[in-house]
Swiss-Prot record:
GO terms for cellular component: cell leading edge; COPI-coated vesicle; cytoplasm; cytosol; endomembrane system; glutamatergic synapse; Golgi apparatus; Golgi membrane. Belongs to the small GTPase superfamily. Arf family. It is found in: Golgi apparatus membrane; Synapse, Synaptosome; Postsynaptic density. This is ADP-ribosylation factor 1. It comes from Rattus norvegicus.
Length: 181
């Protein structure tokens, strides 16, 4: 009998877990975002060859965030991380107008993968502190997000170094997880 109440309590108040894959072109700010969320501070980063993985606790949800390197030579390896991914965070350097089409191509290629069909999409329009950064509406247009008819998605303007927008994005992800059956 006590076990029933323990399971009910855990179901109502227990921690949920969510597997998140964070990808984007190289130098978009993925690793800076990961460690800003994990440690609350800015870390000095070098290009990620392979991946970083950390658990971020937020609002009773344990996010396991896989930050995968974005250099073009290692992007084909992204697919090895797709299995069991519930949320995809795609990080865009909002200041990099020259590569936004490349970012769109990579995003659309990933979203076509069967293993990611049920994953929700959060786009971080990063580096909003830079003077020539595209705003979230412009990034939405350039990435073709409005064409995603059967995908739950959200875009959040962010600045990884200050942390602006990061927790708003996690709020959206946690609400999506809570609303899943």
């Amino acid at each position: 009998m006590g076990n029933i109440f323990a399971n009910l309590f855990k179901g109502l108040f227990g921690k949920k877990e969510m597997r998140i894959l964070m990808v984007g072109l190289d130098a978009a700010g993925k690793t800076t975002i990961l460690y800003k969320l994990k440690l609350g501070e800015i870390v000095t980063t070098i290009p990620t060859i392979g991946f970083n993985v950390e658990t971020v606790e937020y609002k009773n949800i344990s996010f396991t965030v896989w930050d995968v390197g974005g250099q073009d030579k290692i992007r084909p390896l992204w697919r090895h991380y797709f299995q069991n991914t519930q949320g995809l965070i795609f990080v865009v350097d909002s200041n990099d107008r020259e590569r936004v089409n490349e970012a769109r191509e990579e995003l659309m290629r990933m979203l076509a993968e069967d293993e990611l069909r049920d994953a929700v999409l959060l786009v971080f329009a990063n580096k909003q502190d830079l003077p020539n950064a595209m705003n979230a509406a412009e990034i939405t247009d350039k990435l073709g997000l409005h064409s995603l008819r059967h995908r739950n998605w959200y875009i959040q303007a962010t600045c990884a170094t200050s942390g602006d927008g990061l927790y708003e994005g996690l709020d959206w992800l946690s609400n999506q997880l809570r609303n899943q059956k």
